[in-house]
From Swiss-Prot:
GO terms for biological process: translation. The lineage of its organism: Archaea, Methanobacteriati, Methanobacteriota, Stenosarchaea group, Halobacteria. Gene3D superfamilies: 3.30.1440.10. The keyword Membrane does not apply. This is Large ribosomal subunit protein uL5. Keywords: Ribonucleoprotein, Ribosomal protein, RNA-binding, rRNA-binding, tRNA-binding. GO terms for cellular component: ribonucleoprotein complex; ribosome. Belongs to the universal ribosomal protein uL5 family. It holds the Pfam family Ribosomal_L5. InterPro entries: Ribosomal_uL5 (IPR002132), Ribosomal_uL5_arc (IPR022804), Ribosomal_uL5_C (IPR031309), Ribosomal_uL5_dom_sf (IPR022803), Ribosomal_uL5_N (IPR031310). One of its GO terms (molecular function) is rRNA binding.
């Protein structure tokens, strides 16, 4: 059952919303490139990013567990929706990018595609990954500590619901 009105069966508790948007830039190493990536990400999302660290050692990439290798920022509420209005036109969204619970991810190959950014030969070009988490009202029941319950299957978001939400609210066409 989708969130669209079906013969008068539409209910506001079935309307999907954007819970959060996570914007991530993986640099692969610390130092100056990571500092530049943090600065770029802060300009794009207008929020202070946090560093991400390597979860395990990979000798071939010369990365040790605990080394800072990337940066990310989590956007919620109006900030998340404003960012999506800017970022979604820069990406081609395909149905394969949606999971079975309605979440989706996409990449932006060059940070210079954002209106606030210009190419600087001293910095170079960085790409970024965007992950969008969609929920319906009532999903907190699953996450709360006391008396948590599972979400009924007829209330869970599907990929079809997420595509419909994206196309109607953000004016984006999702390709097959």
């Amino acid at each position: 059952m989708s969130s669209e009105p079906d013969a008068g069966e539409f209910h506001e508790m079935r309307e999907p919303t954007v819970e959060k948007v996570v914007v991530h830039m993986g640099v692969g190493r610390g130092g100056e490139p990571l500092a530049q990536a943090e600065e770029i990400l802060e300009e794009i999302v207008e929020q202070q990013p946090v560093r991400t660290t390597a979860q395990k050692t990979i000798q071939d990439f010369e990365v040790r567990e605990g080394d800072p290798i990337g940066t990310k920022a989590t956007l919620r509420g109006e900030d998340a929706e404003e960012f999506l209005e800017t970022a979604l036109p820069l990406a081609d969204i395909d149905r394969k990018q949606f999971d079975e619970t309605g979440n989706f991810s996409f990449g932006v190959e060059e940070h210079t595609e954002f209106p606030s950014q210009e190419y600087d030969p001293q910095i170079g070009i960085y790409g970024l990954d965007v992950t969008v988490n969609l929920v319906r009202p009532g999903y907190r029941v699953h996450k709360r500590d006391k008396v948590s319950r599972s979400i009924p299957s007829n209330h869970r978001l599907t990929a079809e619901d997420a595509v419909t939400f994206l196309e109607s609210n953000f004016d984006v066409e999702v390709s097959e």
